[in-house]
Amino acid sequence: MKKLFISLSLMVFLTGCNDSAVQNRIYESVSAQVTAYVSEFNSNDEEIYVQEYDNLEAEQFLMDNIPFFECPDKELEKTYYFRWWTYRKHVKATPEGFVISEFLPDVPWAGKYNAICCPGMHQFAEGRWLRNSLYLNDYAAYWCREKDDARRYSFPIAYSFLEFYKAHPDMEFIRKSYPALKEIYKGWEESRWDEQAGLFWQLDGYDGMEVSVSGGLSNDATGYRATINSYMYADADALAQMAEMLGETADMEVYRAKAEMLKNIVNEKLWDESARFYKVIPRHADMSFSPVREQHGYVPWMFGIPDRSRSDAWHQLTDPEGFKAPYGPTTVEQRAEGFKVVYEGHECQWNGPSWPFATAQTLTALARTIHRDGENEGATKEAFLETLKTFSNSHRRTDEQGQTVCWIDENLNPFTGDWISRTMLLAMDYPYRERGKDYNHSSFCDLVISGLIGIQPQVDGTIEIEPLLPEGEWDWFALTRVPCAGKEISVVYDRTGNHYGCRPGMTVYVNCRKAAHSDTYSVNVNL
């Protein structure tokens, strides 16, 4: 892979030419596309639940806030804008500031203002790319006040806050959040740490993954899971970094030690060598592994816990007997006893259906793996793009008039693309009409921005850019107006120079001025 390393100290030398004409052409073209997409989404929408920004305000919200993206894959591009259009619906003003909702209708298991922490990691990953940082600043403050509710479901909150900080650095945000984050971490240790087993445990449902195959192996659906243990590692590591930033040396050493311990126990205790996968150990049993691979076994890769020697686990993602399906990935390997897709019992089952929540985790994990370790075994750019396209194409529904419309809901039939929970709830005349419509339980835009195009802000204020497109896949693309570490980043690729009328190759702009160029889009740029 060709690599470019460019420091900010060289910017004066490199930015003598302002390619404003190219950027203006892109802005005008994409602005028109945004208008068209919003018009389509609005016309196809039954606006049942309205929060801060209704559909009439959707176009202005997107124009004011989101990074612009265009590419040759128009279905992927449409899904990108659709997910921003739906995220906007979940921005909710309250007397105490903004929160980001999961469901649009109020549901009885939510906390104050209908907030639920379960998808928090996805909501922060996605929302950090909005220009207006107030939404997530307020939302973070909400969880710091509602500390008990922040532990109602598994939620790597310190990690999520730090990811937001990387895009919108503000030391006062860290300083204000840090005491509450320490309390939340301590609460997990007091309630979910099993000293005898040397692991954290969780109910599958409070991981947000109810009716799981591994959960059924314990009489109370509890287990020592790679999810909660990986989240606790990620939070300890984030708290150590925050402590260092704040000059809290003693805290830094404590949390570093906790993180190192957790990384070791995930690798030593939750890795099934015979299956070459991270698995659940059901609680109240003989400490043996669940016999099945479940998709959440990829979660440790989100946080850099495994080393390269375990990358063969990624072959399962593209194996039709593993997790691959037309509208997958499936939540359980398809070869396993216990895998099923049914329309009876609980409407939210994690024993086979495809869940956007899990798909987003897995794609984040795969992107991080390739960015960190390079391609290896099944961890390839081809696997990432193939799975991202499958995920994108799953964001569809055929309506009553036979028209295909963009849609995001709770869980999918991995073989037909039907939204299972929706079908079941409609049949039972459920009181919350269209409960899962526009469901804000996963990320997608972040997978394009930080994954596919590879914009990765760092704690120290640097920005690494490494696209994950297989060489020769696209002839052109542009991702512009990305707010990142106090700067505005744009990445423009044109193989021939004919599409945008610019120099062939990939150009990176910082604050509208050229900062780097490569002849290919296999590039790593440190700004």
Feature map (PLM): residue ranges:
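Extended glycan-interaction surfaces of carbohydrate-active proteins
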Residues: 74-113, 128-144, 190-224, 264-354, ...
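C-terminal beta-sandwich/jelly-roll accessory domains of carbohydrate-active enzymes
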Residues: 475-527
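The feature captures the catalytic groove of carbohydrate-active enzymes
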Residues: 26-50, 57-60, 147-155, 189-257, ...
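Positively charged n-region of N-terminal signal peptides that target proteins for export
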Residues: 1-4
